[in-house]
Every structure is written in C-alpha cells, then in structure tokens.
C-alpha cells in the first residue's frame, strides 16, 4: 500500500496538505527562518513508522533539525548538500546509491537564494527530472525553497503543472502568513487558487481560526482594488471599491484576485521598474482576467515607460491630463475584457526592451552606425517605433565640430556622431511629432540658427537604408571632435549657476597723489 504524507501545517484539510507517493511538491517561503521551522514541523508531522529522508543544503542537518522524542518518525535518513548547482543535478543519483527510495518522503531544504543564479530552463528541467524520478521509484518529494524574491521561481514553475503535483507559496504578512496555493494535488483530489491565512508561533504552524470557516470567493469581477490617490480624495464610489494607501498594498491585495480591477498610481519616474515588476507578477500568476490599470498622477511617464508598463501586462495607462470623470470612463471601458498580449516570463527581458541602447553622447562614426543598426534589427522592439535619426548641416561659417560642442543629450540612448560635414543624431524611442521638442532640450540655441539644413528618418527601413549609406563613407571624411582644453582654468571670484559662469568684481580703492606721497 502506498504511503500518504502530510505537510506540517496543523488544521489544514486533507486536499491541501496530503502528499501521496509518486509526486513532487514545490513550496516557496520568503523567509529562511520560516522555511527551517516548516521543514522541522513537516518532519514532526509524519507517522512513527514513516520512511523519511531530510536533505539540507548548505548546512549540517544537526544544526537545522530540531525534534522532540514524541513527534516524527523513529528514523530519519539525513543528507547534506553543498550550496552549489552541481549538487542539485546529482541529488537523484546520490540518493539511490544510499537507500531504496520506494515509499520514502524526501524533504529538501534549499539554501537561501539557492536558485537565484539558475536560469528558468534549468529550473524547469530539474523539476521534470525529479518528477520522473519520483514516479519511477514511487516516492514523494517536497522542495522547500527560500528566497528574497520567490516570484522569480514561482512564475516559470506555473507551466510545470504536468510535473509538479503541488505549487504553493508562504508569504509573511506582519502578524500572519498567507498560504497561497497555485494548485495542490493529493489522494483526495486537487485544489487550486486558494489563499489561506496561517499562523506561526511557539506552538508551530497552524491554520488561522478565521480561515477555517472563510469561503473562497468564486467571482470578484466587480471588485476594484485601487490606490487612494486615483480618486483624488473622493470616497469609495460603491461597495465594490477598496482603497489602499500604497502600491505595495494594492499589489498584495491583487495576489488573491482572479478577475478584479487593479488600479495603481504613479507620481514619479523612479517608480517605473518596481511597478512594472508588480504588474508582470500579477499578470503571469493571476491570469488574463485581471484588469490592471495605471493612472499617472503627475506628468512623469515617457513613451518608453508607458511601453514597459503595457508590455509587463497593464491593460491601460491613463495619462495625467485625463480628468477624474474621464478616468472613471476609461476604467469602465476595460470591464469584461480579457488580456490577450504575450508577456515574457522574465521581467529582465522587458527591461532590455525598454533600454536596448546603453549609450549616450558622442560616438565614433562606425560605432554609431553599429549601435543604430543593432537597435533597428532587434526583433523584440516594436516596428517603426524604435527612434528617430536626424542629420543636421551647420550654418555657413560654423564648423560641424563647433556645432557638436552645443549638442548636450541628457537621455540614455540618445547618441550622435559627426562626419561628412554633418551632425547625425539618433534619439531612441522618440516619436516624430516630438522631434522639435527633443532638439530644443538638446541644443541651447534654436536649431534654425545653428543649422541650415536637416534630414529626418523615422521608419525602420528608412533608417537602415541611411545606415548602409553612412557605412560607405570613407574614414578620411569622418570628423573628430575638437580637442579638450588642457591646463587648469583658474577662475577668480566666479560661481556657476548651473548654466554658465559669472564673475564678481573685486573692489579696489584708488589713491590720490597726496596719499601716494
């Protein structure tokens, strides 16, 4: 008869804690101390005659395991693994060499951040290999993973439903923990998309009393989880609205949603990356029924920022120019919609999309051509929206090297070069209708006073054709910037106000002839 093991959380019903042989369960825990405690309580929850093996990574088992004589199996096979990826690869072979794995429960306590430097492909391959191994030997395998960013491992594992019998996370919420079950298969059936409150204290892990009778919502399509700033001080508009003070609280509430509307607020450019991670996590983990909306409270989003948020999984980005009534109309317009765009598994890929050109300022002629060509041929970027290239010819009497000294790009990805008596600029992700505004920020003087002629390319095929022509220019016709002045410039009684230097005269008293005598 096959054995059925149990997870070490008291009062859980069988459907979400039983682990029969032949399956693999993966449990993410965001704090290592909680992972160790749950590891020990799971050992203690097994029957006296159970066959259990404890695998500790990066530590000695005797330093981790803490059991009394009244709980747990009579015998526990102990194993230790070095904190190296190679140890995880060889774990299956090493276990077979040490014992007969049939009807065993293997509990692996991973070292903190053990999977951090292992890519998603290798992680999924290891899970699939472990699943085949557990099915062949008729044993159960529980992996407890602790990491600062458990979503990094959770997201790629969501597609491993054929290999994992269970996938869940335990996240610390101040005085309690959330037991977030993506799915959990047992001998009693399978349960999915459950969020349970659990407590951890000196008595161990147990289901919170109010969670024992709480009913999981079947549909939250009418629910709206919003940042309080979105309503601009107005109270909740109906019983379906729930307001939160921070985006972090909105994100944590959205983790339990299925089809609700999630409203984030953004006030400054520095929030972009974190907000993008929140949106990406919700979209990958909670599905396509969520309506995720970002409202810009103050003008802070560039075109690249908006594209990053939409690529991360946002359904809509509401600009700061939209009034509250217009904002509510836009929120209503996305109801009953399903998100259909493809979202990459790795958020780092999206960051690469938004900043593909990590250069700024002057580049040599050949380096400029190579950089622009790489951007244009990047298939991950949207077509005909990669940027604008403009060639400027100086006005009569002005050398192109002198015009270069006036060119001061501030954005990463804006580069320029000089050659063939032209100043050529490439402004990444700049729209053609914003070109004049961008040039006014780059040059301190009107471009009409500095340059006599300009040519603009904004479509991919146009820019690529011009790059081919530019690569044919002989190096002898490449211009070089003016040499920097050498020596120390000693400015007396002068201050810089951020734009130019200003000298302050020193007072000198004139003397008369009588005083000189």
From Swiss-Prot:
It holds the Pfam family CBP_BcsE. GO terms for molecular function: cyclic-di-GMP binding. Keywords: Cellulose biosynthesis, Nucleotide-binding. The keyword tRNA processing does not apply. It comes from the Bacteria. The keyword Ribosomal protein does not apply. GO terms for biological process: cellulose biosynthetic process. Disulfide bonds: none annotated. Belongs to the BcsE family. NCBIfam families: cellulose_bcsE. Required for cellulose biosynthesis. Binds bis-(3'-5') cyclic diguanylic acid (c-di-GMP). This is Cyclic di-GMP binding protein BcsE. It comes from Klebsiella pneumoniae subsp. pneumoniae (strain ATCC 700721 / MGH 78578). The lineage of its organism: Bacteria, Pseudomonadati, Pseudomonadota, Gammaproteobacteria, Enterobacterales.
């Amino acid at each position: 008869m096959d054995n059925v093991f149990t997870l070490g959380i008291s009062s859980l019903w069988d459907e979400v804690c039983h682990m029969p042989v032949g399956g693999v369960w993966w449990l993410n825990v965001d704090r290592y101390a909680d992972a160790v405690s749950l590891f020990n309580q799971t050992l203690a929850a097994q029957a006296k005659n159970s066959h259990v093996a404890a695998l500790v990574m990066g530590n000695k088992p005797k330093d981790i395991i803490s059991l009394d004589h009244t709980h747990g199996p009579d015998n526990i096979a102990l194993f230790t693994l070095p904190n190296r990826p190679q140890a995880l690869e060889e774990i299956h072979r090493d276990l077979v060499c040490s014992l007969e794995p049939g009807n065993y429960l293997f509990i692996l306590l991973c070292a903190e951040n053990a999977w951090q430097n292992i890519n998603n492909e290798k992680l999924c391959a290891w899970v699939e290999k472990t699943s085949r191994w557990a099915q062949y030997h008729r044993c159960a395998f529980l992996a407890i993973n602790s990491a600062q960013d458990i979503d990094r491992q959770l997201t790629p594992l969501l597609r491993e439903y054929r290999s994992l019998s269970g996938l869940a996370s335990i996240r610390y919420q101040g005085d309690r923990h959330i037991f977030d079950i993506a799915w959990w298969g047992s001998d009693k059936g399978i349960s999915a998309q459950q969020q349970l409150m659990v407590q951890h204290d000196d008595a161990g892990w147990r289901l919170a009393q109010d969670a024992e009778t709480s009913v999981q919502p079947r549909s939250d399509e009418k629910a709206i989880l919003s940042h309080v700033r979105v309503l601009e001080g107005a109270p909740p508009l109906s019983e379906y609205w729930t307001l939160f003070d921070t985006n972090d609280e909105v994100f944590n509430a959205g983790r339990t949603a299925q089809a609700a509307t999630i409203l984030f607020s953004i006030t400054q450019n520095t929030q972009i990356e974190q907000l993008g991670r929140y949106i990406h996590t919700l979209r990958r983990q909670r599905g396509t029924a969520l309506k995720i909306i970002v409202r810009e409270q103050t003008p802070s989003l560039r075109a690249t920022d908006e594209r990053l948020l939409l690529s991360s999984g946002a359904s809509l980005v509401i600009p700061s120019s939209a009034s509250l009534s217009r904002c509510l109309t836009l929120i209503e317009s996305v109801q009953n919609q399903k998100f259909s765009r493809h979202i990459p598994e790795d958020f780092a890929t999206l960051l690469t999309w938004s900043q593909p050109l990590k250069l700024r300022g002057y580049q040599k002629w050949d380096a400029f051509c190579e950089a622009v060509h790489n951007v244009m041929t990047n298939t991950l970027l949207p077509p005909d929206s990669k940027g604008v290239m403009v060639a400027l010819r100086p006005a009569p009497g002005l050398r192109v090297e002198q015009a270069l000294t006036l060119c001061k790009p501030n954005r990463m990805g804006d580069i320029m070069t000089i050659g063939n008596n032209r100043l050529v600029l490439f402004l990444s992700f700049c729209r053609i209708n914003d070109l004049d505004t961008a040039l006014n920020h780059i040059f301190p003087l009107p471009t009409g006073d500095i340059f006599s002629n300009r040519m603009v390319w904004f479509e991919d095929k146009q820019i690529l054709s011009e790059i081919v022509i530019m690569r044919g220019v002989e190096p002898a016709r490449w211009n070089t910037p003016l040499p920097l002045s050498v020596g120390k410039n000693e400015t007396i009684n002068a201050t810089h106000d951020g734009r130019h230097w200003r000298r302050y005269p020193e007072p000198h008293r004139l003397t008369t002839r009588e005083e000189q005598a």
